[in-house]
From Swiss-Prot:
Belongs to the RecA family. It comes from the Bacteria. The keyword Cytoplasm applies. This is Protein RecA. One of its GO terms (biological process) is SOS response. One of its GO terms (cellular component) is cytosol. Transmembrane segments: none annotated. Its main location: cytoplasm. It comes from Prochlorococcus marinus (strain MIT 9515). Residues 1-20 are annotated as: Disordered. Can catalyze the hydrolysis of ATP in the presence of single-stranded DNA, the ATP-dependent uptake of single-stranded DNA by duplex DNA, and the ATP-dependent hybridization of homologous single-stranded DNAs. It interacts with LexA causing its activation and leading to its autocatalytic cleavage.
Length: 370
């Protein structure tokens, strides 16, 4: 090494040491001024991996990359009677099963405690608020988040967060953009606290139609654009099929599209059954994924496990799995193991039941098999 090369190397090392010294000095000063954790190296962060809350549907957990992310904002939107509230009640039940605390801000004043209890929600320990105004609702949400004691807050719904000016005014008064301004201010205020507390906040939202849209999708959500930007996950839930036994309707088939996801790949699709009075069919989700991963084989209308037929038609197979809990638990373990190993399934969920002629026959079986 020549003298000139050695001089350049020594100069570079000296400059690097000075930069490190200056950086450590400013980092220490920032922490003294603003508190520990106000700035950090990303590699030193204590929570590099985002923890999740189960949705209650195995197929949707898979589509989301594990479930609802903790410490993030989630928006669930869709048409009426598509399963939005049911989806969040299952999330509340999952949080409570793990010893967490959940709150439900019922701006629509439509929560059914009996139905919530049937889904597994501990209604005696569920925090419920029925606010009079949108400002009151969002202030309650902010205080719950700041407490750091609550793991999940559900707001049902954004459309029902009525600004105080609108309530105090007369019917027919125009308060243009008041709800959008309210949501924009609220999101700016609570987002930072959500990340620090690790609390997940799920906003339910309704659909509206834009006037004068000839081309493209005329649907939009209420409350302006702020929630769309601040949400880490946005779920579009739709009812795609009514489940029947003969002429009796006993549930719906729901399809959820992950419209936005900042913590896992977006645009995945999940499907699951929602049974009236019972909620999401967890066994149905398990059967769908077991079939996708070839653990349970379907030939025509018959389902078989380890070479033995276990049920004719999807409904009978689900009943058989519910009656044989040891085998069900074993199948669930194998499914989760295969998915962890990276086994691919269609769109990381199931195809629509009537997506091809063969599945259309099975869809008919579901309606008719008792």
């Amino acid at each position: 090494m020549s003298f000139e090369e050695r001089r350049k190397k020594d100069s570079k090392e000296s400059s690097s040491k000075e930069k490190d010294k200056a950086l450590n000095l400013v980092l220490g000063q920032i922490e003294r001024n603003f508190g520990r954790g106000s700035i950090m190296r990303l590699g030193d962060a204590s929570r590099m991996k985002v923890e999740t809350i189960s949705t209650g549907a195995l197929t949707l957990d898979l589509a989301l990359g594990g479930g609802y992310p903790k410490g993030r904002v989630v928006e669930v939107y869709g048409p009426e009677s598509s399963g939005k509230t049911t989806l969040t009640l299952h999330a509340i039940a999952e949080v409570q099963k793990n010893g967490g605390i959940a709150a439900f801000v019922d701006a629509e004043h439509a929560l059914d405690p009996v139905y919530a209890a049937s889904l597994g929600v501990d209604v005696e320990n569920l925090l419920v608020s029925q606010p009079d105004t949108g400002e009151m609702a969002l202030e309650i949400v902010d205080q719950l988040i700041r407490s750091t004691a609550v793991d999940l807050v559900v707001v049902d719904s954004v459309a029902a967060l009525t600004p105080r000016a609108e309530i105090e005014g007369e019917m027919g008064d125009h308060v243009i953009g008041s709800q959008a301004r309210l949501m924009s201010q609220a999101m700016r205020k609570i987002t930072g606290n959500i990340g620090k507390s690790g609390c997940t906040v799920i906003f339910l939202n309704q659909l509206r139609l834009k006037i004068g849209v000839t081309y493209g999708n005329p649907e939009t959500t209420t409350g302006g654009n702020a929630l769309k930007f601040y949400a880490s996950v946005r779920l579009d839930i739709r009812r795609i099929q009514t489940l029947k036994r003969g002429t009796e309707e006993y549930g719906i088939r729901a399809k959820v599209k992950v419209a936005k996801n900042k913590v896992a790949p977006p645009f995945r699709i999940a499907e699951f059954d929602i049974l009236f009075g019972k909620g999401i069919s967890t066994t149905g989700c398990l059967l769908d994924l077991a079939e996708e991963t070839n653990i349970i084989i379907r030939r025509g209308a018959w389902y078989s496990y380890e070479g033995e037929n276990i049920g004719q038609g999807r409904d009978n197979t689900i009943i058989w799995l519910d009656q044989n809990l040891e085998i069900k638990k074993k199948v669930e373990g194998i499914v989760k193991s295969k998915l962890t190993e990276g086994t691919e399934v269609s769109s990381n969920s199931m195809k629509a039941l009537n997506s091809n002629p063969e599945n259309a026959v099975i869809a008919n079986d579901i309606k008719t098999v008792a």
